[in-house]
Amino acid sequence: MTSLVSLENVSVSFGQRRVLSDVSLELKPGKILTLLGPNGAGKSTLVRVVLGLVTPDEGVIKRNGKLRIGYVPQKLYLDTTLPLTVKRFLRLRPGTHKEDILPALKRVQAGHLINAPMQKLSGGETQRVLLARALLNRPQLLVLDEPTQGVDVNGQVALYDLIDQLRRELDCGVLMVSHDLHLVMAKTDEVLCLNHHICCSGTPEVVSLHPEFISMFGPRGAEQLGIYRHHHNHRHDLQGRIVLRRGNDRS
């Protein structure tokens, strides 16, 4: 399978501060990669590297031709006094045709919001509008920066269900950043735990194996949510430096 984007031993420094060290990953069509880690771990910097906004100091980046990327930012800041409807907000994207707006909203089950004020949307509704905006680019790769932040568990289930549907329909790759260190989308193909470097990687444990979780969130939640169990062989201090490796007395 041809890669959309691949990073090999990528490192990024800002001044004397090393933010990313020897990071490798591969994004493929139809595959979901979830990136998680603590605050300040370099997740946003890694996303910017994938988007082509940051040039690494070391390592190799390969992109598949003229890659079309749809990006959903972590937060959207709007002036609360600015009269801005969903339709007008989506028209602000360069190259957007007005006839494409309603179909994009309907694709994310948000067609009814087309004339709603952006400032009145809930967290889940805002994420759907931002996702519709990303789809206007007909993306081969969707990059979602903490899409479930501020969304309750039921909203997360619905959003993950939608992302899975879009992934299958478009056969696009998905890079998703998660603020939750353990609860991830169950259909994620690979999870990377980042703390300036890749601490560990693997697949999520499907929540359907846990009857108590099913009883709390129902079978639909169990289908879409998964638990990722970390398997680090080291730990970090408050500055992100490796201070201990298991089996060693010194770092």
Curated annotation (Swiss-Prot):
Compartments where found: Cell inner membrane
Root EC class: translocase
Topology class, membrane: Peripheral membrane protein
Pfam families to which the protein is assigned, alphabetical: ABC_tran (PF00005)
Quaternary structure note: The complex is composed of two ATP-binding proteins (ZnuC), two transmembrane proteins (ZnuB) and a solute-binding protein (ZnuA).
Residue ranges constituting the ABC transporter domain according to the UniProt record: 5-220
Residues annotated for ATP binding in this entry: 37-44
Molecular function GO terms recorded: ABC-type zinc transporter activity; ATP binding; ATP hydrolysis activity
One annotated Gene Ontology cellular component of this protein: plasma membrane
Known catalytic reactions: Zn(2+)(out) + ATP(in) + H2O(in) = Zn(2+)(in) + ADP(in) + phosphate(in) + H(+)(in)
Protein origin, superkingdom: Bacteria
Taxonomic lineage from the root: Bacteria, Pseudomonadati, Pseudomonadota, Gammaproteobacteria, Enterobacterales
EC number(s) reported in the record: 7.2.2.20
Record PANTHER family: METAL TRANSPORT SYSTEM ATP-BINDING PROTEIN TM_0124-RELATED, ZINC IMPORT ATP-BINDING PROTEIN ZNUC
Record's keyword terms, sorted: ATP-binding, Cell inner membrane, Cell membrane, Ion transport, Membrane, Nucleotide-binding, Translocase, Transport, Zinc, Zinc transport
Coiled-coil parts of chain: none
GO biological process, one term: response to zinc ion
UniProt function note: Part of the ABC transporter complex ZnuABC involved in zinc import. Responsible for energy coupling to the transport system.
Recorded family membership: Belongs to the ABC transporter superfamily. Zinc importer (TC 3.A.1.15.5) family.
Protein name: Zinc import ATP-binding protein ZnuC
